[in-house]
Amino acid sequence: MCTKESKMNYKFDGSKVYFTSDTHFYHSNIIGFCKRLFKNVEDMNETLIENWNQVVSQDDIVFHLGDFCMGGSHEWTKILNRLNGKIYLVLGNHDLKNIRQGYASRFELTSMQMHIEVDKQKIYLNHCPLLCYGGAYGNTWQLFGHVH
């Protein structure tokens, strides 16, 4: 369950919460760039979807920390229709070019950054790591993607 505390503060209680980033669905160049051991983009997409759904149930919460998918609405919708969970997307550099209003609504929330609390632990979410972030000098964790 999610209760909105302020504009970008959310508190989650009672659900399984997962964090991931940089899936790069439909990004064929990422296979070579990051030395992903897949034959092609279809093999990569199918493996990522299968692994995701083996762990995440429909009621679980997933924070995706950016670079979700390449392509247009057909590709994004095709992937989103197959993934379990309630997905919150922190926009990554590739998402900024590819996110469209038509399927942005398929996410629980899309934002450049999020402040959340899980089991009384404050967590700051962003796609890129930041040296100075809200809570950097307190007991707030920072989770990020981007650096592969």
Locate the predicted segments by residue.
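A short acidic-Thr-Gly-centered motif at the start of a beta-strand
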Residues: 7-12, 132-136
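Conserved beta-sheet core of the metallophosphoesterase superfamily
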Residues: 104-148
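Short, Lys/Arg-enriched N-terminal segments with co-localized hydrophobic residues
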Residues: 1-7
